[in-house]
Amino acid sequence: MSLADQVLAVNDDLPIRTDKPVHSGKVRSVYWLTEEDSARLIKEKGYNVAPDAPLAIMVISDRISAFDCIWHGEHGLNGVPGKGAALNAISNHWFGLFKENGLADSHILDIPHPFVWIVQKAKPVKIEAICRKYITGSMWRAYEKGEREFCGIQLPEGLEKDKALPDLLMTPSTKGILKGIPGVPEADDVNITRQNIADNFAAFNFSSADDIALYEKLLKDGFGVISEALANVGQIFVDTKFEFGYVTDAAGNEKLIYMDEVGTPDSSRIWDAQEYQAGKIVENSKEGFRQFLLNYFPDPDILLNKDRMPEREALARDNELPEEALMAVSRTYINIAEKITGSAIVLSDNPKQEIIDILGREYGLID
C-alpha cells in the first residue's frame, strides 16, 4: 500500500445519489441530496431540523491548498496523508465543546465516517469572521509598512512582531464578491469595518441588525473556548477564521450557527507555547507549509502578489513538491489533532471505498 493510495485526493466522483451538480471546493465537496432522501433521513435518523430541510453530504479530501492554489508532491502524492481526517476530528471536537459551553450549534447533523459530515443547508453570512490575538502574518507586514488602521480599528504605535495584541481583534473580510455595497470594493476577501456591516447588514445576509452583536459574541466566545483548551495542551491560539450561517430547526425557529470548520490548522495559526516562551515560533498549522513554499521557490513575490496569479497557478501545477514536505504537514496535522482530541487519528487504506460502503449500507444513498 503506497502513501498515494492512503490519500483521498479526488472527492467529487463518489456515486452518491444526487439530482444537482456536485459543488467541489478547494478541500471539500458537497453532494446535495434529493428531496426524497433528505426527508427520509430526517425521519429515520431523527435529525432536529424542519422535515423538508435540504441535506447534503460533505466529503473532505486530503488536498492541500495554500496561496489560493492546490499543491501536489512527487511519487503521485496529490495530498497529505491524514489531513482530512485530522481536520474533521478537530472541528468535531470544537463544535462539541461549543455546545457544552452553551454557544451555538453547527450545521453538522451526523458523522458517518471520519471524512464525511451530513449537514443541513444553511444561509451563509457573507463574512469571513477573523479574530486575532497576536500581530503576525499579513497584519504584521502591513503594520511594519506604516499601516495603523485595520477594519476601522486603530492600532497603537510600538507593537512588535509575533507579540500579543492589546485586545482580541475582530478583522472581518468579505466572503465572495459582494456588489453594490457603499465603501466595499467588489472583490473577494476585502477587509471591512463593523460600520460597513451595520450599515448594510442585509447585504451581508444578516437577518437582523441585532445579529451582528450575536455573531461577534459567538466569535469571541468561540475563540476563548478554543484558546483555553489549547493552552491546556501547551499550544497558543494565535488567530483564526470562523464562518456563520442561519438554519431552521424542527420547530421552525431560525438560528445563527457556526459552519464550515473551526479552530483547525487550515483556518488558524497555532503556536507551540514552550517554544514561544523560548523565543521561537513553531507552527502547528498550515502556516508552516506556507513558510516552506515561500522559502522553496526563488521568487516568493509570486505567492504574495495577487497580480501574479497566472504565474502562481503555473507554479503549483508544474512543480512536484518533495514528499518529505507533505509528510511534514501530515505529522503536524495528525499530532495537533491527537493533542486536541485525545484520540488517535487512524489512516485508512482505502477511504473512498469505506465511504461508499457506509453511505450505502447505513444511509441508502448509493445507487
From Swiss-Prot:
Output the Gene Ontology terms for molecular function. Answer: ATP binding; phosphoribosylaminoimidazolesuccinocarboxamide synthase activity
Which Gene Ontology terms of cellular component type are present? cytoplasm
Q: Which terms are listed as keywords in the entry? A: ATP-binding, Ligase, Nucleotide-binding, Purine biosynthesis
Q: Which reaction does it catalyse?
A: 5-amino-1-(5-phospho-D-ribosyl)imidazole-4-carboxylate + L-aspartate + ATP = (2S)-2-[5-amino-1-(5-phospho-beta-D-ribosyl)imidazole-4-carboxamido]succinate + ADP + phosphate + 2 H(+)
Give the top-level enzyme category. Answer: ligase
Q: Which CDD domains match?
A: SAICAR_synt_Sc (cd01414)
Taxonomy, superkingdom: Bacteria
Pfam family of the protein (one)? SAICAR_synt
- Pathway assigned to this chain's UniProt record: Purine metabolism; IMP biosynthesis via de novo pathway; 5-amino-1-(5-phospho-D-ribosyl)imidazole-4-carboxamide from 5-amino-1-(5-phospho-D-ribosyl)imidazole-4-carboxylate: step 1/2
The answer on whether this UniProt entry bears the keyword Nucleotide-binding reads yes
Q: What is its EC number?
A: 6.3.2.6
Keyword ATP-binding among record annotations: yes
Its BP terms in the Gene Ontology are: 'de novo' IMP biosynthetic process
UniProt record similarity statement: Belongs to the SAICAR synthetase family.
Xref: NCBIfam families = PRK13960.1, purC_vibrio
Protein name as it appears in the record: Phosphoribosylaminoimidazole-succinocarboxamide synthase
The record lists the organism as Vibrio vulnificus (strain YJ016)
Q: What is the lineage of its organism?
A: Bacteria, Pseudomonadati, Pseudomonadota, Gammaproteobacteria, Vibrionales
